[in-house]
Amino acid sequence: MCSSDLDIPFLKQYDTKIIVNVCGKSEADYVDAVEKLGEQPVDLLEINISCPNVKEGGIAFGQVPSSAEAITKAVKKVAKQPVIMKLSPNVTDITEMAKAVEAGGADAVSLINTLTGMKIDVNRRTFAVANKTAGVSGPAIHPIAVRMVYQVANAINLPIIGMGGIRTAEDALEMIMVGASAVAVGTANFNDPYTTIKVIDGIREYMEKNNVADIKELIGCVR
């Protein structure tokens, strides 16, 4: 959540939708945050269920179908905005998680979150990250993300926001063609803040070149 009540109103000066990502360590944390955001000028809520569930020994909400469904139901009861459930790739079968949040009443899903990785400092002979493990993002995870978006698109009937290693229009189009209704750019923005604009322009160029009148023609065209 934003650290100040001034942050969200500040963003309203821009002609775009505002999506707030919500994290928590317990169901109560999520519910409390969502209730507070109900009074803010926010368009959509993205619920990050990759967070560890303290009451369940630290297992992420998004790794247990019953927990994912329960947190979705709890959030939907109090949410005043549409709810997007952000799915973790660190599971045996991501379609089971997608089905769980769909059953819980989610309005959409976003995927994938970061993969869990580890880095060792060989000179100091210790972990390079204080938490021992950390999220891996960027181009390396893109093929995995495309595969999971494809799987989820064929398993549920909710809109999908595809993400994971998108740097170019081609990367974004891959996501769209396997079923994503929208895409998100994360890590690439740290290298080039104009990445998102370049991706949008690139998609438009592709559509013009290939005589695609409506991007909906591309959503899920690869099955």
Regions found by a protein language model. Give the residues of each.
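Alpha/beta enzyme core
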Residues: 25-161, 167-185
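A short, charged, Gly/Pro-tolerant segment at domain boundaries
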Residues: 216-223
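Structural signal for hydrophobic packing residues in well-ordered secondary-structure cores
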Residues: 15, 38-41, 76-79, 203-207, ...
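Short Gly/Pro-enriched loop/turn and capping motifs at secondary-structure junctions
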Residues: 166-168, 190-191
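C-terminal helical cap(s) of enzyme catalytic domains, especially alpha/beta-barrels
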Residues: 120-134, 176, 188-213
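Short, small-residue-biased leader/transition segments that mark boundaries at the very start
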Residues: 1-3
